[in-house]
């Protein structure tokens, strides 16, 4: 599978709230339209910027659906406290017409166990087989996805088309050399705003998923 969704600058949206602390989806859509109008290629919702742990699954799904209905290209974050919820979010994203997935590792239980992460990634990727996806790698999750696991997953899930790296310069260089540099069809997305120059100039990155939303 090839996809052009993972290119250019893709801001991760925050979740605006009303006075009663419920999500303000009208404001969410308005901000997405503003950013796309300024030249952003798409938006991400819900990544960590969107405060997904504070939202219900239904609220997250509503936000995605509202963005899609507004004609916004949206990449959906799959962070969740369990694999079943992450897979349900991915399946919903595919159903309503989202454009891609940002697949978050297993977080709370056995996060350092490679077999557990493999099973988690497989479940999420299988739930939305037509949606292009990148794995989100972050040292803050306590687990790093390495090339061997990435290519095991890619061999079975053609919708895995790239890698977002949130670590520092060394992590981004590793991703470029060992993962995306090994296959010209793979996309490398910069995940740290301060590493944008390094990512584009030294790592041949395709785009950046940034915290400017």
Language-model segment annotations:
Residues 2-144, 152:
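Active-site beta->alpha loop and helix N-cap motifs at the rims of alpha/beta catalytic domains
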Residues 123-129, 138-213:
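Catalytic alpha/beta core domains of metabolic enzymes, predominantly
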């Amino acid at each position: 599978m090839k996809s052009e969704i993972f290119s250019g600058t893709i801001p991760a949206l925050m979740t605006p709230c009303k006075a009663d602390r419920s999500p303000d989806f009208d404001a969410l859509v308005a901000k997405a339209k503003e950013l796309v109008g300024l030249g952003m290629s798409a938006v991400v919702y819900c990544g960590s910027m969107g405060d997904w742990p504070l939202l219900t699954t239904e609220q997250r799904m509503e936000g995605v659906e509202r963005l899609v209905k507004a004609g916004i290209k949206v990449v959906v974050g799959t962070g969740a406290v369990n694999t079943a919820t992450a897979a349900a979010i991915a399946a919903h994203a595919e159903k309503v017409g989202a454009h891609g997935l940002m697949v978050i590792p297993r977080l709370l239980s056995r996060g350092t166990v490679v077999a557990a992460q493999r099973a988690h990634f497989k479940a999420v990727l299988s739930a939305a087989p037509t949606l292009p996806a990148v794995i989100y790698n972050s040292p803050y999750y306590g687990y790093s996805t390495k090339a061997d696991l990435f290519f095991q997953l890619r061999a079975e899930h053609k919708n895995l088309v790239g890698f977002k790296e949130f670590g520092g310069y060394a992590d981004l260089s590793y991703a470029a050399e060992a993962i995306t540099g090994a296959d010209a069809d793979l996309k490398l997305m910069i995940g740290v705003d301060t590493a944008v120059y390094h990512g584009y100039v030294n790592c041949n990155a395709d785009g950046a998923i940034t915290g400017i939303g």
